[in-house]
Amino acid sequence: MILYFTGTGNSRYTAQELNRFCGDELVSMNREMRKRRQDPYNARYAYTSERPFVIVCPTYCWNLPKVVEEFLLNSRFLDSRDMYFVLTCGSGTGQAGKRAAQVCETLGLNFRGLASVRMPENYISLFRAPEPDEAVAIIRSSMPLVESIAMQISSGRDISDSFAGREVPSFVVRLFYRLFVHDRRFYVKDNCIGCAACASLCPTVNIRMRGGKPEWQGHCTQCQSCIGVCPVDAIEFGGRTRKKRRYYLFADGRQKFPNEKRETEEDEEKR
């Protein structure tokens, strides 16, 4: 079973490519997270698979996203006792492998390794997204590695991370979360069309529409989905994102361009 968490589509696309080679069940953690917040009594908390569990997600501050860690620690994994991690990143994964091993130990699972896949930069609250042609080149250059990872998992071998880089001190991670992982600086401009694409995709159900405009509720994970999916680029994060190109990767591998109508995740999966 491949469970993926995605903000702007990089990890979803990677999970889909892994699935193309592995032929396994594909589960959206985004959808599962929304269900847990909206209807906790009827949400799914147990996952059963005879094949290894494969967790695909972005790298947040050289570590596992806290929202993914919390999801895993509040889930039950049945039958298979093996878990792999595949993280998308712009550079290195730091101590993500160490933390993933700790999560597996807590869950009573066998940590079978972590591998990273370089994908286009999407964290425009700090950096700049690549131009479309450059993004395509980055994605294409990473797909042979994704196939190799899939083959290793299918054959039952451990995987390893060739892009881990140095471990980042824990105080740096804490400082990063305190300074950047919040929604206090998000705002919407006058060109917002009230389509609610941002609210429908938010994995933490952190956006509510009021008067046809999005309002953030204080439990943002900075996945960048809202700022990336907006069809008219109406969402900003303070002054850091002004005039920056947005990045969003559709399920079929296309990039979003300004003024392109945005489908919901459910719409995409029906195609």
Locate the predicted segments by residue.
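Membrane/wall-proximal cationic-aromatic binding patches
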Residues: 36
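FMN-binding flavodoxin-like domain, especially the glycine-rich phosphate-binding loop
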Residues: 2, 6-13, 17-33, 43-57, ...
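A short, structure-level motif marking secondary-structure boundaries and short turns
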Residues: 84-86, 183-184, 211-212
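A mid-sequence, solvent-exposed acidic-amphipathic segment
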Residues: 165-195, 200-203
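A short, compositionally biased domain-edge/stem linker segment
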Residues: 39-41
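Iron-sulfur cluster-binding cysteine motifs and their immediate structural context
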Residues: 187-188, 197-221, 225-242
